């Protein structure tokens, strides 16, 4: 099987970030499947609040960090967005990073993994992200992962714990299989016929 390049995006800027556990879990599990996977941490990238999108800079004049992230997005075969929920909404850090780009996202599949400290598992944020990612030109797969309470599901090291962790381990293969099917289909189609725009 071909090795697919998958970017995992995570967006909390908080000091005591819990969602990084889920991001690390996903990166590790995709690595076991032979994927070339990289975590893109919005806090580490540290983009300013959106003023100009990457595409609005003259060619070669965008800040280096935008050039680097744009290149990684263009080279990826698929994406996973690890999303937390803030007051029924999306995390501003991840949304800010995502909004800096547009055409770079086009014609690739994406999956959503949500989490929260509570029992609702960030599902309201996942619902909001679904429409956003579709509008940005991605095909969002139907399988999702929803983790909550995250502190009772994953250890600090990102290992599954307890009954919630067992449920996550059981759900992950279908989630990954769904994304990988679409990743492979999109890659074949890209080779067969260039995207129309």
Regions found by a protein language model. Name each.
Residues 1-96, 103, 160-197:
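N-terminal beta1-alpha1-beta2 submodule of the flavodoxin-like/Rossmannoid cofactor-binding fold
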Residues 24-25, 98, 128-131:
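Short, solvent-exposed amphipathic alpha-helical segments in soluble enzyme
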Residues 47-50, 147, 154:
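Short clusters of hydrophobic/aromatic residues that line enzyme substrate/ligand-binding pockets
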Residues 94-100, 136-139:
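Short, electropositive alpha-helical surface patch
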Residues 106-108:
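His-Asp phosphorelay/catalytic-motif detector in bacterial-type signaling
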Residues 110-152, 167-170:
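Short, glycine-/small-residue-rich phosphate/pyrophosphate-handling segment
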Residues 152-159:
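Amphipathic alpha-helix from the class-I
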